């Protein structure tokens, strides 16, 4: 008989982070996967990061997660998206050598302390009654082996009753050539979880030797690539180029003439796909006024002959894929290595979860990744690390949930959106979803989260010490710049343009001026050069945003006050005067943990919030008296 503190099902991006996080905290953890050879597989595009997504990778890394370190080992084309805009919307992104990424992740996972990996298929899990509540008891494999555990994390990705479509061809699969998870889907139905259906897609893979690169636009990465991980010193792999081409009217004509043959137009038309990553068929249908759509040709590795054509996800038959591709410049003689396809799969209504990602129905059961209705490697990793941390922490009798607020992290924004609002389509993060994005930047994730992770043993002492040294240097440089006061006349002598208004300013204050940067003020303060690039950059960004932080920090304080006004889990909303039946039902279903969470539920009015506050204050005063 085998027993583990935490069992994780699925070896994708959510599963790897969940298993590693639980193990770091000290839980005896088991990761179960269909195939060890697919742990860390990049199922779709060979890239990590992007706008908002790159910040999530940094947040995962700040909590000692794996994704940032692994992509730094596999990066072959790095860039900062939105570099021309402010730091709050910078998006670190890196193309990966797909094979090196997977191999690096597998090496880490297979040698992780406290973590065992088992190659098996889980068909069912059992529950027991614990203090009048259903709790996880064990998982059962397809070979009828029983593995006992009180904490189970499901990270099934697109495998939960997954079905692949290529035109009219349909086959059960979670990924091309890999069997779906049918038994677990039936188990979730048995326990009355609210299930829905979503879909996503992937483009055909192309033979690099059949592409005419001479007619394509070369796109180089950053000359000095920036690592994702705060503990990575450099990017060591050679950096290679991507190439840009585009569809045209001939391409669109082929697609229009064959829309009736695409699975997305027929079998899948009622199943929601990612809104912000539409198929090429959907692009042509929705944006009929557009004459072309960009296609980025991305190498899948340094020694790979496969090209990933980003921008032409399709569910059309193979003959249509060929006909469409051969109208695109550079692809006139292209060979397809693997067909593009669409995959549909089950997901659960994430409003059935707490902010810890534990289910409300069954104690000890957690969901993370695409099973919660999200799309993207980064979103999955962010959920995985939170589920893993909470599953491990909850083994203790004095367990305090590890919850990241909307003001703490993009991960907090995502989870709060999911468990409060739910989703009817694949959810992805954007900077626009974060109210406090001036504070939630990709450059400061370690300053925001590493100490929080260290307090719950999710972060190593080595990383924490590095953070404290960095914080000390940031504080030192900031104080130096704040204590050097200079007049406009003195600044003019250094050719630094400011208004000649006679007002004395500190060097730190000067950084908020639009035409002044840290390099400019280095003329006055040589000591800046003694600090690391990361520290100098951090101080410069803080100086740039300083005037805007005053308002945002006040908003954050108001938000935190509402988040700290807790609503008891056993509250009877039907007993609160002034709440309509509809609002009572919504609140009873979602069970918001705080006034802040209740306020974000659609349909819950300001008057309803006031009624809840009055009720809470009355009962608090009654208890005191």
Swiss-Prot record:
Q: For binding FAD, which residues are annotated in this chain's numbering?
A: 10-15, 122, 181, 370
Q: Where in the cell is it found?
A: Cytoplasm
**In the UniProt record, does the keyword NAD occur?**
yes
Q: Name one GO biological process term.
A: tRNA wobble uridine modification
Q: Which GO terms describe its cellular component?
A: cytoplasm
GO MF annotation: an example:
flavin adenine dinucleotide binding
The prosthetic group or cofactor this protein requires is: FAD
Q: Which residues bind NAD(+)?
A: 273-287
Record's subunit section: Homodimer. Heterotetramer of two MnmE and two MnmG subunits.
Family (UniProt): Belongs to the MnmG family.
The UniProt function text for this chain reads: NAD-binding protein involved in the addition of a carboxymethylaminomethyl (cmnm) group at the wobble position (U34) of certain tRNAs, forming tRNA-cmnm(5)s(2)U34.
Q: What is this protein called?
A: tRNA uridine 5-carboxymethylaminomethyl modification enzyme MnmG
* Organism field: Ehrlichia canis (strain Jake)
Q: Which gene encodes it?
A: mnmG
């Amino acid at each position: 008989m085998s027993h583990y503190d935490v069992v994780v099902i699925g070896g994708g991006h959510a599963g790897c982070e969940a298993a590693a996080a639980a193990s770091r905290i000290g839980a005896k953890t088991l990761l179960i996967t269909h195939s060890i050879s697919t742990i860390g597989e990049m199922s779709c595009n060979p890239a990590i990061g992007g706008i908002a997504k790159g910040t999530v990778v940094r947040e995962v890394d700040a909590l000692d997660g794996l994704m940032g370190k692994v992509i730094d080992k596999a990066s072959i084309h790095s860039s900062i998206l939105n570099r021309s805009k402010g730091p709050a919307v910078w998006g670190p992104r890196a193309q990966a050598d797909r094979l090196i990424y997977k191999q690096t992740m597998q090496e880490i996972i297979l040698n992780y302390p406290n973590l065992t990996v088992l190659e098996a298929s889980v068909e069912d899990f059992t529950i027991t009654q614990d203090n009048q509540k259903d709790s996880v008891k064990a998982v059962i494999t397809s070979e009828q082996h029983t593995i006992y555990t009180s904490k189970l994390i499901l990270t099934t990705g697109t495998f939960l009753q997954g079905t692949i479509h290529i035109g009219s061809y349909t086959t059960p699969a979670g990924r091309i050539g890999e069997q779906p998870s049918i038994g677990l889907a039936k188990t979730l139905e048995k326990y009355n979880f609210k299930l829905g259906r979503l879909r996503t897609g992937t483009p055909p893979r192309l033979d690099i030797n059949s592409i005419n690169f001479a007619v394509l636009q070369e796109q180089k990465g950053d000359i000095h690539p920036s690592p994702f991980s705060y503990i990575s010193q450099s990017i060591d792999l050679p950096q290679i180029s991507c190439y840009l081409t585009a569809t045209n009217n001939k391409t669109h004509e082929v697609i229009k003439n064959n829309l009736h043959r695409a699975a997305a137009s027929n079998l899948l038309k009622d199943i929601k796909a990612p809104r912000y990553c539409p198929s090429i068929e959907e692009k042509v249908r929705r944006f009929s006024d557009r004459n072309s759509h960009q296609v980025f040709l991305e190498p899948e590795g340094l020694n790979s002959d496969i090209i990933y054509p980003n921008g032409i996800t399709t569910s059309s038959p193979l003959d249509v894929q060929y006909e469409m591709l051969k109208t695109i410049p550079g692809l006139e003689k292209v060979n397809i290595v693997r067909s593009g396809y669409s995959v549909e799969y089950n997901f659960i209504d994430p409003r059935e979860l707490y902010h810890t990602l534990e289910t409300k129905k069954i104690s000890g059961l957690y969901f993370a990744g695409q099973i919660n209705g999200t799309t993207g490697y980064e979103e999955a990793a962010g959920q995985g690390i939170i589920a893993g941390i909470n599953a491990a922490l909850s083994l203790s009798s004095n367990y305090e949930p590890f919850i990241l607020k909307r003001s703490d992290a993009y991960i907090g924004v995502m989870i709060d959106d999911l468990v409060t609002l739910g989703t009817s389509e694949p959810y992805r993060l954007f900077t626009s979803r974060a109210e406090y994005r001036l504070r939630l930047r990709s450059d400061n994730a370690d300053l925001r989260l590493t100490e929080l992770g260290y307090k719950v043993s999710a972060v190593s002492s080595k990383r924490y010490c590095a953070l404290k040294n960095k914080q000390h240097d940031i504080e030192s440089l900031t104080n130096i710049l704040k204590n050097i006061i200079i007049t406009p006349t003195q600044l003019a002598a250094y050719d630094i343009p400011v208004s000649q208004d006679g007002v004395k300013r500190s060097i730190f204050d000067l950084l908020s001026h639009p035409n002044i940067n840290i390099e400019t003020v280095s003329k006055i303060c040589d000591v800046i050069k003694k600090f690391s690039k990361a520290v100098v950059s951090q101080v410069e960004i803080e100086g740039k945003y300083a005037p805007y932080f005053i308002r945002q920090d006040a908003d954050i304080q108001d938000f935190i006050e509402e988040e700290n006004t807790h609503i008891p889990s056993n509250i009877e909303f039907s007993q609160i005067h002034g709440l309509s039946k509809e609002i009572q039902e919504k609140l009873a279903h979602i069970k918001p943990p705080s006034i802040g969470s209740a306020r974000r539920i659609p349909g819950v009015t300001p008057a309803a919030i006031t009624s809840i506050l009055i009720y809470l204050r009355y009962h608090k005063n009654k208890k005191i008296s």
